[in-house]
């Protein structure tokens, strides 16, 4: 049931929103399929942007999210190990810095990436990184 206002609209001579092609945006409750398509587009974009996700292989949404988390944490480690950032960390005493807890290996691709990561110079694999997820 819709509520009606006892006051007449001031816009009686104007064109209706419908005739102008203007519509109110629907909430996700009004249009769940639109939300689903939008989320699928976001997952597709994430799959394109993260280099460790195989492009020619079907991966689940959970795998995409885990790859994204790993990628962000790896970028954080690389950033934290940069000499300028390292010197800033030493200037802030009392900061609690814990080592990163790795996520569960999803598939062979992740295992291969882990083996490749062990070949990086030790300054990139510092244990002084900040934990992003508690």
Curated annotation (Swiss-Prot):
Description of how the protein assembles with itself and partners: Interacts with GATA4 and NKX2-5. Interacts with NR0B2. Interacts with CLOCK and BMAL1. Interacts with IFI204. Interacts with NEDD9/HEF1. Interacts with ASB4; this interaction promotes ID2 proteasomal degradation.
Gene name tied to this protein: Id2
Protein name: DNA-binding protein inhibitor ID-2
Molecular functions per Gene Ontology: protein dimerization activity; RNA polymerase II-specific DNA-binding transcription factor binding; transcription regulator inhibitor activity; transmembrane transporter binding
Disruption phenotype: Mice exhibit disrupted locomotor rhythms, reduced locomotor activity, enhanced phase shifts and an increased rate of entrainment when subjected to a large delay of the photoschedule. Show a reduction in lipid storage in the liver and white adipose tissue.
Protein function: Transcriptional regulator (lacking a basic DNA binding domain) which negatively regulates the basic helix-loop-helix (bHLH) transcription factors by forming heterodimers and inhibiting their DNA binding and transcriptional activity. Implicated in regulating a variety of cellular processes, including cellular growth, senescence, differentiation, apoptosis, angiogenesis, and neoplastic transformation. Inhibits skeletal muscle and cardiac myocyte differentiation. Regulates the circadian clock by repressing the transcriptional activator activity of the CLOCK-BMAL1 heterodimer.
SUPFAM superfamilies referenced in this protein's UniProt entry, alphabetically: HLH, helix-loop-helix DNA-binding domain
Induction: Expressed in a circadian manner in the liver with peak levels seen at CT12 (at protein level). Expressed in a circadian manner in the suprachiasmatic nucleus (SCN) of the brain and heart with peak levels seen between CT16 and CT20 in the SCN and between CT8 and CT12 in the heart.
CC per GO annotation: cytoplasm; cytosol; euchromatin; nucleus; protein-containing complex
Phosphoserine: modified positions: 14, 25
InterPro entries for the chain: bHLH_dom, DNA-bd_prot-inh, HLH_DNA-bd_sf
Domain of life according to the entry: Eukaryota
Originating species: Mus musculus
Example GO biological process: lymph node development
PTM summary: Polyubiquitinated; which is favored by Ifi204 and leads to proteasomal degradation. Ubiquitinated in a ASB4-depedent manner, leading to proteasomal degradation.
Short sequence motif Nuclear export signal: positions: 106-115
Pfam families recorded: HLH
Domain notes: The bHLH domain is essential for its repressor activity towards the CLOCK-BMAL1 heterodimer.
Subcellular location: Cytoplasm; Nucleus
Main location (coarse class): cytoplasm
